[in-house]
Design a protein with these regions (language model features):
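Conserved mixed alpha/beta catalytic, RNA-binding, or beta-rich assembly cores of soluble enzyme
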Residues: 33, 44-45, 51, 158, ...
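Intrinsic-disorder-associated, low-complexity terminal segments enriched in Asp/Asn/His/Tyr and depleted
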Residues: 319-325
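Conserved N-terminal beta1-alpha1 strand-loop-helix module at the mouth
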Residues: 11-58, 174-177, 181-186, 196-198, ...
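Iron-sulfur cluster-binding cysteine motifs and their immediate structural context
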Residues: 113-138, 143-145, 155-171
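Alpha-helix-loop-beta-strand connector modules within alpha/beta enzyme cores
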Residues: 56-88, 206-217, 269-278
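C-terminal functional modules
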Residues: 303-306, 337-407
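N-terminal amphipathic alpha-helix/helix-capping segment at the start of soluble metabolic enzymes
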Residues: 1-22, 72-83, 407
Length: 407
C-alpha cells in the first residue's frame, strides 16, 4: 500500500470512489479485519466501520497488514494500492443502521420452522450452536442472536410467526469516540440522519465539530422523503464553515444490495435527485448498491463513459445473467461532468460476496489442529488471492484502470 492521503480525494474528483461499508452495527472483529484487508488490497478508497474502539483498532491493524503485503501484490501482477481512508459512523437519532435484533429463544414454539434463521444474511441467528465471543474465547452452546454479527437489516422482524423478534436501537455517544479521531488516525466521519431532525443533528455536530479539523471528509447519509433537499440545505448551513470535504450519501434502500439487482434503482434515483439539487459537496450512492449499479449508472450517463476498458472482460461477466436495460430509469442527456455521481458505497452486497471465502477459511483454520490460535487469512495466500479476485471484480467496475497485469 502506498500511503498517499490524497488518493481517495482524487477518486472522488474523478468519479471513481469506492467505499466499503462494514456496518455501523456490525462488530464481528474477525470478519471486519478480513473485509478491510481484502478490499484495501482490491483498491477501496474508504473503509466505513462502527464507532467502536475495538472495531476501529482491528480495521487499523488490517490496513497495516495490507501495507505489508505490497510485495505479495506486485509479485502476482496486481497494481499497487493506495491506503484507503478509515471512516466511522454516528447517528443523530433512531436509525435502522444502528440497531440489533433480539428475542428470547425460550419463548420459541418447539415446532417452529425458524424462518428467522433462514432469512438472516449473516447467520447471526442460531439454535444450540457453539460460538466464540468477540475476544475469541469459547462459549457454551447458544441459542438466539449473536449480537456482534447482527447489523440491523431487519429481515427477521416480519417473518417470525410468533412475533417474538424486536429491534433494539441505540444512538451514538460521540463523547467517547470523538477524541479517538486524532489518536487512531481516523480520516472521515459519517453522520446518519433523517428529514426533520435538524435539532438532533445540531446537538451531535456540537460534540463532533471540535475534531473535524483533523478529518479529510465529512459524509452525511440520509434516506429520501418529502422535503429532502431543503433539509440537506439546512444541514449544510449548520456545518458551515467546514474545513474538510463534504459528501452526501444517498441512502436509497438501506441494507438491501444482496437481495437482487432491482434494489439498486432506489439508490440511483435518489442520487440523481440530489445531483439535480446542485448542493455543494460530492454525491455517493448507497442503500441497495450491487454489481448492477455501475453499469446502470453508465447507461444513464450518471458516470463518465468507458473508453478503453474491458481489457479483462470481467465487467461483462459480472453483469450476467440480468439485462441491465430491464432496470428502467430515464437517461440523462448532455450532462456536464460535475453532475456525475462521484462514487458508490457497498455494504451487504460486498460482504455477502466474500461469505464463501470466510466459510473456506473457517474450514482451513479448523484443520490446524495443533495451533492454539487460528491462522489469519494472509497465512492462506491461495485463499487470499481468491478473495481478492472476487473483490476486484466489484472494485474495478468503477476503477477500470486498475486491471491486473499478466505475470
Amino acid at each position: 500500500l502506498t500511503n498517499t492521503n490524497n488518493y481517495p480525494l482524487h477518486s472522488l474528483q474523478n468519479h471513481q470512489w469506492f467505499k466499503l461499508i462494514c456496518g455501523a452495527s456490525f462488530q464481528e472483529l474477525n470478519v471486519i479485519r478480513n473485509l478491510t484487508l481484502v478490499y484495501a488490497l482490491a483498491g477501496a478508497d474508504c473503509i466505513d466501520v462502527a464507532a467502536d474502539p475495538a472495531v476501529i483498532a482491528v480495521a487499523q491493524s488490517a490496513l497495516q497488514v495490507a501495507e505489508n503485503l505490497s510485495d505479495w501484490l506486485k509479485n502476482r501482477g496486481f497494481p499497487p494500492v493506495k491506503k484507503p481512508w478509515l471512516m466511522v459512523s454516528f447517528n443523530d437519532g433512531e436509525d435502522p443502521h444502528f440497531r440489533k435484533a433480539e428475542f428470547d429463544f425460550q419463548q420459541c414454539p418447539t415446532n417452529c420452522w425458524r424462518p428467522c434463521e433462514k432469512v438472516c444474511p449473516v447467520s447471526a441467528i442460531v439454535f444450540q450452536q457453539p460460538h466464540l465471543s468477540r475476544s475469541g474465547a469459547s462459549q457454551q452452546e447458544y441459542s438466539g442472536i449473536i449480537d456482534s454479527k447482527c447489523y440491523g437489516c431487519g429481515r427477521c422482524l416480519p417473518v417470525c410467526p410468533s412475533g417474538l423478534i424486536y429491534a433494539r436501537s441505540y444512538v451514538s455517544t460521540p463523547q467517547a469516540i470523538a477524541p479517538l479521531i486524532s489518536e487512531l488516525a481516523i480520516d472521515a466521519i459519517e453522520i446518519h440522519t433523517q428529514i426533520g431532525r435538524e435539532a438532533d443533528f445540531a446537538r451531535l455536530w456540537q460534540s463532533l465539530k471540535g475534531w473535524v479539523k483533523n478529518l479529510k471528509l465529512l459524509a452525511i447519509s440520509c434516506p429520501d422523503g418529502v422535503g429532502l433537499i431543503s433539509y440537506l440545505a439546512k444541514l449544510q448551513d449548520i456545518i458551515s464553515p467546514l474545513p474538510c470535504s463534504l459528501l452526501w450519501q444517498t441512502d436509497g434502500r438501506p441494507m438491501s444490495g444482496d437481495i437482487g439487482a432491482g434494489t439498486t434503482l432506489a439508490a440511483i434515483k435518489l442520487g440523481q435527485k440530489v445531483l439535480d439539487a446542485n448542493l455543494s459537496g460530492y454525491v455517493q450512492l448507497a442503500g441497495g448498491t450491487n454489481n448492477y449499479t455501475i453499469p446502470k449508472l453508465r447507461e444513464l450517463k450518471l458516470l463518465p463513459a468507458l473508453t478503453d476498458y474491458y481489457a479483462t472482460g470481467r465487467e461483462k461477466q459480472l453483469n450476467n445473467p440480468i439485462n441491465i436495460n430491464s432496470l428502467s430509469l430515464p437517461a440523462r442527456q448532455g450532462q456536464h461532468i460535475n453532475n456525475y455521481i462521484n462514487g458508490v458505497a457497498y455494504g451487504s452486497y460486498a460482504r455477502v460476496l466474500l461469505a464463501p471465502i470466510w466459510q473456506k477459511l473457517e474450514e482451513m483454520q479448523n484443520d490446524q489442529v495443533n495451533l492454539a490460535d487460528s491462522l489469519p487469512l494472509e497465512n492462506f495466500p491461495g485463499l487470499l488471492e481468491e478473495a481478492l479476485l472476487l473483490a476486484r471484480e466489484l472494485v474495478t467496475q468503477i476503477k477500470p484502470q486498475n486491471i491486473r497485469k499478466t505475470v
